[in-house]
Amino acid sequence: LAAQGAQGVDLEALAEHRGSLFGGLSGPQPAQKMFESRLAGALAGLDPARPVYLEAESNKIGDILIPGSLWKAMLGAPRIAVTAPLADRARHLIDTYAELTGDPAALSMIIDALRPYHAADQIADWQAQAKAREFSALAQGLMRDHYDPRYARSTARKAAVAAIVPLNDLSEGILRSAAAQILSIKGV
């Protein structure tokens, strides 16, 4: 979107966290006040007459809280849902979290942190996939059985979806086309 001239704020970059149990591997997050200072700077540079694009599934990014006034505005703002095939999303996650494929102990700890939410046999299956380096099956299972259902419950409490942009895959050409499609949506 930014490459096509859209305004956006990358909340995950400001929070130095990717926003899930797997998201905090690059080091410590900034203090809440530092995040808010960065956010204020990013918002000050925006044109209020133009749409602003944000991504957030939750009011919390790691240990950082999105300020209440911004979160409230986000909850009431028009939403665009972008969908993609599970296998393509899995490949993207494997690339994004490549550091985990080389750190079995860290990956195991993160999977163990899901124990309060899933049956022991599900955790054992994910642990076995991680140990066998079956990262595509692991990523697909985590999305299908953990993240997607949580995301669906979370989004059900927010404003209605203004548009759905389905992607056939996550190739550069498809992403550019999707960005153009998003920017052409009226009322957003």
Language-model features, listed with the residues they occupy:
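Conserved NTP phosphate-binding and transfer environment spanning the P-loop NTPase/kinase superfamily
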Residues: 72-79, 83-188
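Conserved nucleotide-sensing/catalytic segment adjacent to the nucleotide-binding pocket
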Residues: 4-73
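Hydrophobic positions on the alpha1 helix immediately C-terminal to the Walker A/P-loop
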Residues: 1
